């Protein structure tokens, strides 16, 4: 298996103006476009959090997207990524918005 094909899982939390600006919808759409699986949800702290799973090259692209792009009306202050690990199989079959 090539390096870019290694499956990884990583948790994320995005800080800034990320609620009420369709951030979850755009995150889900971008994740699906890249073929990633996982989830995204708003938190009570005014952040957005979730988990990404997929090939490391696609996860890296999505991490950069979460740090720098987001939804058109969002303003991202920072993105935290943690608990990254190599996985043998995906835990999810889709990219879901969790309410």
From Swiss-Prot:
EC top class, as a word: hydrolase
Coiled-coil residue spans: none
Domain Acylphosphatase-like: 9-99
EC numbers: 3.6.1.7
Modified residues (N-acetylalanine): 2
Catalysis: reaction(s): an acyl phosphate + H2O = a carboxylate + phosphate + H(+)
Keywords in alphabetical order: Acetylation, Hydrolase
InterPro entries cross-referenced by the UniProt entry: Acylphosphatase, Acylphosphatase-like_dom, Acylphosphatase-like_dom_sf, Acylphosphatase_CS
Record-linked SUPFAM superfamilies: Acylphosphatase/BLUF domain-like
One Pfam short name: Acylphosphatase
GO MF annotation: an example: acylphosphatase activity
Active site: 24, 42
Family note: Belongs to the acylphosphatase family.
Protein's name in the database: Acylphosphatase-1
């Amino acid at each position: 298996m090539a390096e870019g094909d290694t499956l990884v899982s990583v948790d994320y939390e995005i800080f800034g103006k990320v609620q009420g600006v369709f951030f979850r919808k755009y995150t889900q759409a971008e994740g699906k476009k890249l073929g990633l699986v996982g989830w995204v949800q708003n938190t009570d702290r005014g952040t957005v959090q979730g988990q990404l799973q997929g090939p490391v090259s696609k996860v890296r692209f999505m991490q950069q997207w979460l740090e720098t792009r987001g939804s058109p009306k969002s303003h991202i202050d920072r993105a935290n990524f943690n608990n990254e690990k190599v996985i043998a199989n995906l835990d999810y079959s889709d990219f879901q918005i969790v309410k």
